[in-house]
Amino acid sequence: MTATTRKTTVGVVFGGRSVEHDVSIITANQIMRAFDPALYDVVPVYVSRDGRWYTGAPLLDIKNYESEIVSHKGIAQVVLSPAVQHHGLIVNPVSGRFSRSEVLRLDVVFPAIHGTHGEDGTLQGLLELADIPYVGCGVLASAVANDKITAKALLNQHSIPVIEGISFSRADWLGDPDAVIARIERTLAFPVFVKPATTGSSIGIGRVSDVGLLRAAIDIAAHFDRRVLVERAVTGGVEVNCAVLGSGNDLRASVLEQPVSWEEFLTYDEKYRRGSEGMKSAERIIPAPIDPALTAKIQEYALRAFRAIDGRGTARVDFLVKPEKGEIWLNEINTMPGSLAFYLWQESGISAAELVHQLILLAREAHAEKRRTSFDYQTDLIALAAMRGLKGVKGAKGGVEKARA
């Protein structure tokens, strides 16, 4: 970098109104440490559990979160402005007086919120309004991948194998639970998995071996989402995961991992509580002990799934596999994987610093591509309406009144 080259300011947004709030703090801490300080200025942007936004140097130290983080000296409240002229954060905003507040410009935003209000397309929509380049999948891909029910339907259309399942709403369950249970019994054989449609990190998920335990599992899942998915449990299968990096047809698949679980499925505790590094510290076998032909097939399914949702950036695609039979089922696509799947990319020859750098480049490429799309269409409709005195609208109203008469 030359003396005249300005470093890129990256806002890393994390925390959030999500059941995966704490997981997000760990992931963001790893992301912020990965940036090359010679190339990037990192701005931590913390979203509290009640939805307030903050920035400040104390947010860079994960030890500060052991106490009330927002009470630390040097923390300022901010809002991410949707107005394109701000291109970043309004610091210490006063209602109705943004012009007197400091504007902290962000060149790129790096979303690191897992699950609701961050990984589901909502934060991405805000960034689209603000016209700020951002890392990762866009609104549509984020929303589709985050919803297990919608993703399953899309992947099925693309001939990517998924596990059989049924879905229903919380209203269906509360209205007639016996009918829902009868439908499950008609459609699926036990054991089954009961899942909220949109949560991650195994939160709200239960494995049910008989109908007697089904009601309690559905109650738990319905507590975390208004829609519930029930899937056949793949007995004798192993979990195998693959990360994807890139956009469009320029995609790369990582080596495979096989998480080591001591439970019937990989629980929240196994993913995060066994170490301070989140998914990075979970037990796993890399590369997964899968034969080369099956490995290539899993990697190809991961790439196809990422293209199907129109993904960009990086994601971790999770599979259930029966290696001895060559059977594969895609379980889910994580567009904001825990620890950003650093461990998979490291084993694939990409360092954490190089990964975040590549993701920033992809974000800027996507933003440049967006600028090729026209969002303005000039017409004379306003002039015509002004000339007519909006008589057309009044006439329509009169027509309605006459029809009612």
Where are these regions (language model features)?
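ATP-binding N-terminal substructure of ATP-dependent carboxylate-amine bond-forming enzymes
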Residues: 1-140, 144-150, 157, 168-180, ...
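ATP-dependent carboxylate activation and anion-phosphoryl transfer catalytic cores
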Residues: 2-8, 17, 37, 159, ...
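A short glycine-rich, hydrophobically flanked beta-strand micro-motif that places a catalytic Asp/Glu
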Residues: 43, 228-232, 240-241, 310-324
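ATP-grasp fold ATP-binding core
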Residues: 155-156, 184-202, 226-237
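Phosphate-binding site of ATP-dependent enzymes
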Residues: 209-300, 328
